[in-house]
Amino acid sequence: MDRTETIVVGAGPAGLLAAREIARRGIEVRILEEHPVIGEPNHCAGLLSVEGLRRLGIDPSPGFVQHEITGGRIYSPSGASIEIAGSRTRAYAIDRAAFDRHLADAARGAGAEVETGRRIRGLLIRDGRVEGVRGRDAYAKVVVDAEGAAGSLAREAGLPPAAGLLAGVNVEVSGIDVEPHMVEVWLGDVLAPGLFAWVIPLGDGAARCGLACSSGDAFERLKRFLHRRFGSVRFSPPRRGLILTGGPIHRTYLDGLLVAGDAAGQTKPTTGGGVILGGICAIEAGRTAAEGVEADDPSAGFLKRYQRAWREALGREFASMLAARRLVNRLSDERIDRLFDAFRREGLEEKLRGLVDAGDMDMQSGVILAALRDPGLLGVLVRGAGRLALAELRALFNP
């Protein structure tokens, strides 16, 4: 019988960080990854904050950092823009495949076993308790499900699927004119319903461009955007993926099972980014899995400490970003254009820049709260979004 102390399903960042944490605590851990090469297929936009990497205990490495980002420019549907420029490096454009391999090396270095080309066909469940995985069956005291946005294992175990599923696509474009250290975010329901389009500079006139949407074909939408933004350009083959903006699932543990990362919906609802917040949660999952093995108690009653931990650390962040996402999703393109006009007309661009520059790319509740407390910004938001929508957002900070 194939048996180990813990199994992690999925060798993306969440799975690798969970495994690194388990191995550091001296507990056996085996990572099972369905694809033959870690980091492939790569369907991530590849933009990570400096502070986020620090939170995960990852030093920026030339092996995966492609370019430094200091700020961004946000565009309205009509093409008006607000610049959020900073004087320091705020984020890195990364090679996601190289980043994942970097994490895999760290997990192996801590003592984890990584097995690629291992397709999992389901969970081994007996008397309501997860005991391992099917497909060349393997048994473990605790299974960490970090399989990604599809979430099939969690659903098999009876947990709800993550909400806010969007189709995303990325391509790389060269020979274009872009600001070398400024990300572009393009809003609009006609362009990208449910999220936005993005341009991430990579240096030397190249950029990673992408789009995510809740309806229609994402690649067709992206091609129209590229033509609008750059004219006739050549681009790399598209890389498609799933993006989640609906917030975490309500329960992330069962007897013998922990769910982390995209599989648990632990992504930023505002942007769909999941590496940092999902990684923070995954480290908590690894810690709890190791403690469950040490205590010889993989019961739900013991493992629920994982959910308590990540909710205490990030619950307000997820809730505030989800409320902000729902508010933005209600806005028509015309309303967004009016908001941009009002920000410029009332001279609030500098104030908005200051809030965002002083804020945190991943822990966004501080920026949201500061905007709601500023009379000028609040007045514009009320006129643009409506009192009811903003009241729902403010209620998060006044329980």
Regions flagged by a language model, labelled:
Residues A11, R25, R101, A106-S236, ...:
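Predominantly flavin-linked oxidoreductase catalytic cores and closely associated redox partners
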Residues R20-H43:
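Glycine-rich FAD pyrophosphate-binding loop
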Residues H35-D59:
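Conserved N-terminal glycine-rich FAD pyrophosphate-binding loop of Rossmann-like flavoproteins
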Residues A290-P399:
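C-terminal helical "tail/cap" subdomain of flavin- and related membrane-associated enzymes
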Residues M1-A14:
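Beta1/beta-strand and adjacent pyrophosphate-binding region of the FAD-binding site
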Residues T6-V8, V29, L257:
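Conserved hydrophobic helix-helix packing surfaces used for dimerization/oligomerization
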Residues S214-E294, A300-G301:
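FAD/FMN-dependent oxidoreductases across multiple families
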